[in-house]
Amino acid sequence: MQTAAGQSQELRVGVVGVGNCASSFVQGLAHYRDCRDNAPLPGLLRPEVGGYHVRDVGISAAFDVSAAKVGRDLSEAILAHPNNTFRFATVPHLGVPVHRGPTLDGLGHYLQGDVAESAWLR
């Protein structure tokens, strides 16, 4: 998207919880980034919404509580256990570290025995 002055405008997104949905979202951004505006795209209803194209979306921050994800680049963390989303795109190094988010409501019942909680900011 461009402003009235012709400058490129990026839509900045923060990811809270680097689970399977986040993995699919990040992979989707990488996969569809270079698609043509009017091309039919399997898996994506519209490449442009509200004047923003998929290529205009950039991730600026990411947060999780898992020791396997905190401190890693988001491109690596989306593949960490227990994520098991189908891998459909190669995500380049993003330069977005996953930060420790607060465990406000605890780990989910099914994750408690499967995920080591990060000690950072506990």
Predicted regions and their residues:
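N-terminal glycine-/serine-/threonine-rich beta1-alpha1-beta2 phosphate-ribose binding loop
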Residues: 2-122
